[in-house]
Every structure is written in C-alpha cells, then in structure tokens.
Amino acid sequence: MSPKALNVRVTTMDAELEFAIQSTTTGKQLFDQVVKTIGLREVWFFGLQYTDSKGDSTWIKLYKKVMNQDVKKENPLQFRFRAKFYPEDVAEELIQDITLRLFYLQVKNAILTDEIYCPPETSVLLASYAVQARHGDHNKTTHTAGFLANDRLLPQRVIDQHKMSKDEWEQSIMTWWQEHRSMLREDAMMEYLKIAQDLEMYGVNYFEIRNKKGTDLWLGVDALGLNIYEQDDRLTPKIGFPWSEIRNISFSEKKFIIKPIDKKAPDFMFFAPRVRINKRILALCMGNHELYMRRRKPDTIDVQQMKAQAREEKNAKQQEREKLQLALAARERAEKKQQEYEDRLKQMQEDMERSQRDLLEAQDMIRRLEEQLKQLQAAKDELELRQKELQAMLQRLEEAKNMEAVEKLKLEEEIMAKQMEVQRIQDEVNAKDEETKRLQDEVEDARRKQVIAAEAAAALLAASTTPQHHHVAEDENENEEELTNGDAGGDVSRDLDTDEHIKDPIEDRRTLAERNERLHDQLKALKQDLAQSRDETKETANDKIHRENVRQGRDKYKTLREIRKGNTKRRVDQFENM
C-alpha cells in the first residue's frame, strides 16, 4: 500500500464499506466509488456525512480533497452515506429498489429514534409494514408468539406511553401484519414511506435562527420550501415560503438573506449562531431548490433510461409476482384437497374399523347361534330318546296287566318320573328353540349391517384412490449526477432559477389517510384500541401539540397551505414580528 494511502470506512444504512484512498482523492471520487459499489444511480438524493473536529455532522464537499476537509482524525476515517435531499412524493420519484431501501431504512431509523415525531397509531401501522418488508408474508406455523421479540419496531416513547406488555404489542403488530399478505417487500417499504412522508417532521432539516428582534426560532428546510417554527414547536410551522417564490439566497457572516421574486416584498433576513451554519443552510437551499425546479422540467435522457429500465424490471417482477400468486393459490388448493383426502381417509379408516367391529360381533353371534343350535339338537335327540323309553315303558305296562300290584305300582312310578323328565326336556327344547329364533333374527340383522358397511368401505376405498397432484412453487425475490454543495466563505450570494408560472404543489396535496379510506379506518381503529391503555402522564410536548392539531383539523399540508396564504410581504412582516 502506498504510504499516502488512507483507510476509509463508509457506513450505509445496511452495510459497512472499506476503501483505501489517496491523499489527493476528492469527495466526489470517494462518493462515486461508494455509489458504484452499491449499484446506486439516483445519486442526487445522497451525500457523504462526517463528524467534524468540533463534533458537528457535516456533508462532504464533492470538489474538495477529502484530506482538506475537517474530518475527525481517525483510522479509518469514518463517513456515513445518507439521504441529503428528500423527494416531494416517494411514489412518483424513487426509481431504483436500492434507493427505495436506503430511504426506507433511514426514515424508519429516524422514526424509531424520535428524530421524526410519529403518533402511536401510525407507529403500529408502520411497524406492521416494516415486518412485512423484513419477513415477508405472515406464516402462523413459523411466526409464533415471541417471533418479533428481537425486532426494534416502535419508538420507545410509544412503548412507555401505553400500559401494554411486549406480547400485547407483538399481537397488535402481527394482527395488522396479516393484512399485508402477498405484498412484495419493496411494496411494503413504499407503503411505509408513503405514510411516513405525511408526518410533519419528515424530510425537514432544522436550524436554530433568530429574527431581527432576537427571538429564538427554527428554520426548516425541505423539498417544498422554507418554513419558520416557534422554538417550542417543530411540528407546526407558522410561516412558509415555497421555493417558487425565492430568486436569490445569500449570507454575510451570521446574517442570511433571502430575496423573494416579488420585488415589492422586503428581503427575508435571519441570523444563525455560526457562519458554518449559514454555509449548510445555503447548500441545502440550493440543492432542494435545484431538485424542486428539476421535477418541473422534462426528465433528462439518463433519467428516462433509468425509469424505462425500472419499468421493465417492475413489469418482470409483477409477472413473477403473478406467477407466484398463481403458484401459491395452486398450492393452497392442493393443500386443501390433500386435507380433504386425509380427512376422508381418516373417516374411511374409522368406518372400516367400525365395520370390522360389527363384523366381529356378527361372527361372534353366529358362533353363539351355532353352539345354541348344537345344544338344541342334542336336547331334541335326548327328548326323542326319553320319549322312546317312555313309549317302551307304557308298552310294558300294557303287556303287564297280570303283574303283581307292587311291581305294577313301581312301573307306574317310573313311567310318571319318565313323563316328568320328558316334559322338562320338552320345555328346554321349546326355550332353546325360542332363543335360536331370536339369534337367527339378530344374525340376519348383523348380516344386513355387514353388507351396508362393506358397501360404504368399498365406496371410501374407491374415493381414496383418486390421483392427487401438488404443484408447489417458490419465488423470492454509471452515470453520475452532480450534487450541489455549498463551498462558501465570507459573503456568498446565489441566484436561483425561477419560473413565476409554477403552481405551488401544496395547493392540491392531501395526506394519504385523507385520500385512502381504508388507511383512514385502520388508523382510527388503532387509535381507539391504544386509547384503552394510554398513560396520559407520559405524554410529551409533541404529543400534546399533535393532539391539538388533530382536534383543530390540521394536518401537514393543510398547515402549509394556511401559512403560505397572503403575499410575501405580509409573511416577511409576520416573521419580523415573531
């Protein structure tokens, strides 16, 4: 390695990259190396951020050597690759999946750390999209209780404000997660951002400033323009200036001057605590204004090609998605059919077992009947024998008319005894005959049942041999554009591209919840659910401000429309009097 080579570590939202650069390497050369490595083409949104020697976060200057910038001396040198500028509408502007992912991760982190205020009900809904983006479709078999225990999904503020256990939070998020079934991970990220961009603090860079009266205020710089906030409320801007009203920005030391297009309006002037703050404000104003104007012009060839490629990729992905959905539907049908077969097979087995039991009972009954018939036949044989013996005795009696009286009496007694024995045997035969008839009836009934059971078993057996087919499919899933960087010292002035015919985009802008009835109902239901466990003693200042804004029917865009009313002069005067 050359002795002049320097080690550099660049942290993106989901990776760490390490490079060796030369002492002559510029910010742009390092930036280009990063975007080439991660495959990013929408470079205009991003920048390299570092911590300077004073501990402040600063954006690297592209056309200045890295070593000549006030980077904190470490080995390796530390940089963060972050979104510097935000789109007006994520759904319209973000082209590449990598761009979408980086924005999603950065915005999600800002919400979880409370850098962007997000009300509790919106936090839970966003968490459900975050789970879909990370884990895909909910699966009740693998995604059991405790599955989300290690995922960071909600701002700590929201958790602290509600008397809910971890399991209850998880169940709430999983309930909404199941609503997103079949949604691609990229689509879940996009839905997350579409909701997040309606949050008041989304995409705003805040700077501490003072007006001429010395009142401490906040300046907010974002994709739509400049806004002024009171010191204790960064949710609700009080005065707004769209980019289309501004023709020049400049600063002299700590004083920052904004010249409106309206020549009759006075300059808009404020004071920053340090000159370096004014440099950052100037750079952000220039970059946001440039992108604001660029959106209102035809796309460059590069962007057209990028969008065409993205459309092709999305169409291909859509086709794959449709194939996947068809495969999933086929799998569900096959699984349902298989379950039906298994249920029928189980029923058949139960019926066959029952038939087997009935058959065994019938066979046992037949054995008993056969035994009974044998006994009956033996009794009949014995009866016949005794009747013959009796007949012989009677014949002897008839022949022995001349017998002695004693012998005759003895013979008569023997005949009477034999008659009684014959009667007894006759009674037994009659009883056994009745029992035999009853058993014959039972056997006949058992045989009928056996025939019915055999027919049913045969039918079930025939059904179980129907061919089964299971089709299971699985599926998952440079041109450089210059970023404007303020490299200013002393008095700096920049004229901005203007067009008096540009319509303020805020005029027709509505929040997604206002435009989407389903989302509106989801948030309303979540708010009602969370209200039952809310601990009002844990409310923050932002919670109270948000609640009051909702009570008065305000949202991000309604507020912006309200504070941009009237001519520029009136708003400048209003600022001076704050």
From Swiss-Prot:
Positions of the UniProt region annotated as Disordered: 463-555
Residues modified as Phosphothreonine: 559
Protein's cellular compartments: Cell junction, Adherens junction; Cell projection, Microvillus; Cell projection, Rhabdomere; Cell membrane
Post-translational modifications: Phosphorylated on Thr-559. In the oocyte this phosphorylation is induced by phosphatidylinositol 4,5-bisphosphate (PtdIns[4,5]P(2)) generated by sktl.
Cysteine pairings via disulfide bonds: none
Amino acid composition bias (Basic and acidic residues), ranges on this chain: 492-555
Domain of life: Eukaryota
Transmembrane segments annotated in the record for this chain: none
Xref: SMART domains: B41, FERM_C
Biased composition (Acidic residues): 475-484
Coiled coil: none
PANTHER family referenced in this protein's UniProt entry, alphabetically: MERLIN/MOESIN/EZRIN/RADIXIN
Designated name of the protein: Moesin/ezrin/radixin homolog 1
Organism field: Drosophila melanogaster
Lineage: Eukaryota, Metazoa, Ecdysozoa, Arthropoda, Hexapoda
Gene field: Moe
